[in-house]
Amino acid sequence: MLKTLLKSVRQYKKETLLSPLCVVVEVFIEMYIPYIMGLLIDNGINKGDMDYVRKMGLFTILLALISLVLGASASYFSAHAAAGFTANLRHDMFYHIQDFSFENIDKFSSASLVTRLTTDTNNIQQAYQMSIRMAVRAPFMMIISLFMAVSISWRLTLVFLVAVPVLAFAMILIIKNARPYFPRIFRAYDELNRKVRENIRGIREVKTYVHEEEQIENFKKSTSKIYKLFRRAMFIMAFNRPVMTMMIDAVMLALSWFGAKLIVGHQLATGQLVSMFSYTMSILMSLMILSMIFTQLMMAQSSGRRVADVLTAKPTIVNPAKSPLTSVTNGEVVFDHVDFKYNKEDAHYALKDIDLRIKSGETLGIIGETGSSKSTLISMIPRLYDVTGGAVRVGGHNVRSYDLKTLRDNVAVVLQKNVLFTGTIKDNLKWGNEKASDEEIVWAAKIAQADGFIREMPDGYDTMVEQGGNNVSGGQKQRITIARALLKKPKILILDDSTSAVDTKTEREIWEALKRDLPETTKIIISQRIVSIKDADRIVVMNHGKIEDVGTHDELIKRNDLYSSIAKFQEENSK
């Protein structure tokens, strides 16, 4: 895990090294000051030598200023390194996620990926900054303080060393009991993010069905779960400070008692006892800092594993290792006894023994009841998923032989869920082809029957689209996404229920334009409405992940019970 994460340090290695270097020098100077203060008391104040007091006082101030500069430098370098490292980490994660297949996304879930990119990386940033500064400072401060304390009085050193194993045992006990809560907390954050995303995305449905109270209650449950888990973890961690305070008070009392006896017995000077107090406090404070570091590292460990899981996840769909095909000759599609299941461990097949040949330039309709795997079937063509068994061929070649960009540039898919991005309508259309000219944009929009309503908008093609396309209707959004797909000038065009929000007249105009202007493009149309596919060259009827029948509209009406029942039902409801 650590090796995976640290690859993202890259250009911030210098700052990562400079921060602990400054800390080490700072600690050496800082730990020398109590020793000087002891000399100042014993050789200056006790003897009435004010010249010595002034000289050592000025020297102490100089050391303190140097220590201040080094401390500020260490803070700057650690903050700079941690922020840069985290920026790289987020970039590496986001870049890697772009290569994920749908299977990878399904495994992690989009809500979990958002949490890992934000909350988890923030935890790692804090832990990294603490590790290259405080995690260096605390042990060095402890070691140097211990050395200085022993050099002053090994007897008094033994007094406070008794407290160290007690504190160490208490810290281990606290950490051991608190650690299991943090993975549960981050899983709860994933669930909260999922609910928030769903609510915001479906806010219109929430208001339409008056489900605000239910959504608020669900949100309360999620936040309450996080609160309870965090409260339990923090309750355990809260014992850390009282235990430390109690031990510090006990040690100081013991030092005062035994130190006073040594002074009375002329075995220790007053200044040396003052120095011992400082070194003892430094050692005990080091332990307190270490306990804080361990707390932060516990949270970061859970976050680190989650981030590393993303970075080390192998995309399930990749380019062929040797000589990928970089051109698609035609739009022929062949499903050769294709089987598919979403989970390889699952016994259930989403698709079973699909055997189908679609000729280049053919218009194929696909219909079936909800859950019959129509969308799953077409997802195999651009390799959004890979088949479990059998093969899918495009243009005479297995889709696994193609360069992914080449394949997907030649297979345009307009999915059920239409997504528009913040920007102008023209910007959204250019997702299909960044180099498209204005003439090509208008050509695609006219085929999709979008040119008319776009020109009626305040700024035409330069009209801004709000987040998620909230300022355009469902039918307008569908037509824009169809135009976007057409700009790819694909060999294969797949419309997955992409005209469900368009009126019948406009839909027919779209089909006529597609047939007229794209005669050589293979067109695959998935629809729940028979009127949308009845004029297709052939229609595939799917049922429970299998092809039940293939034929023209007239043929299927006569011989297929499922198709004829759907047609009859829709005809009766249209009257």
Sequence positions of predicted segments:
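Membrane-integrated ABC transporters
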Residues: 1-33, 37, 45-59, 74-78, ...
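Transmembrane helices of ABC transporter permease
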Residues: 11, 15-28, 63, 130-185, ...
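An intracellular "coupling" helix at the cytosolic face of ABC transporter transmembrane type-1 domains
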Residues: 11-13, 99-103, 119-128, 132, ...
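Juxtamembrane helix-loop junctions of ABC transporter transmembrane domains
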Residues: 21-22, 29-42, 63-110, 114, ...
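Helix-loop-helix
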Residues: 49-53, 148-162, 232-306, 310-311
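Helix-loop junctions and hydrophobic alpha-helical segments within the transmembrane domains
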Residues: 93, 97, 206, 307, ...
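Conserved catalytic Walker-motif region of ABC-type ATPase nucleotide-binding domains
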Residues: 97, 219, 307, 335-337
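ABC-type nucleotide-binding domain
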Residues: 326-575
